[in-house]
UniProtKB/Swiss-Prot annotation:
It is found in: Cytoplasm. Pfam families: FliW. HAMAP family: FliW. This is Flagellar assembly factor FliW. The keyword Chaperone applies. Keywords: Bacterial flagellum biogenesis, Chaperone, Cytoplasm, Translation regulation. One of its GO terms (biological process) is regulation of translation. The keyword Zinc does not apply. Its main location: cytoplasm. Coiled coil: none annotated. Interacts with translational regulator CsrA and flagellin(s). Acts as an anti-CsrA protein, binds CsrA and prevents it from repressing translation of its target genes, one of which is flagellin. Binds to flagellin and participates in the assembly of the flagellum.
Length: 132
């Protein structure tokens, strides 16, 4: 990925993102706020802050269904990337949360993505990123 002012990498999301099903193409680019990236629709109307859940939760085991991976034609482990959407609508950085229940899964070789629903019940839509 490239810096925030550049184009980034374009990914197709055939099913869109939950709540944004009509938006099918996103660009993922680096953010100046590491370890976060920006996932922005190509028309720039919608954007999300995303990061790897492994940046703050080493043992994230979402149990993503095999069908979800096959929907984006991801078979080999080196093709698979998992990201989570970050909620920054807070007054204090300690209250930043990540959606671990519905991760973004990506086939980085075929440039395809999907929002999956993880079957592991221990994860929530608002997992605190920073421990107090």
């Amino acid at each position: 990925m490239t810096n925030e002012n550049s184009i980034g990498i374009e990914f197709d999301f055939p099913e869109g993102i939950l709540g944004f099903e009509n938006i099918k193409t996103f660009i993922i680019k680096d953010s100046k706020h590491k370890p976060f990236s920006i996932m922005q629709s190509i028309n720039k109307d919608v954007s999300f802050l995303v990061t790897s859940p492994f940046n703050f939760l080493n043992e994230y085991l979402p149990n993503i269904e095999e069908k979800d991976w096959s929907d984006i034609d991801a078979k080999a482990e080196d093709e698979k990337v998992i990201l989570c959407i970050i909620n920054m609508h807070v007054n204090d950085y300690k209250d930043i949360t990540a959606n671990l229940k519905a991760p973004i899964i990506i086939n980085k070789k075929k440039l395809l993505g999907k929002q999956a629903i993880c079957t592991n019940e221990k994860y929530s839509l608002r997992h605190k990123v920073f421990k107090e």
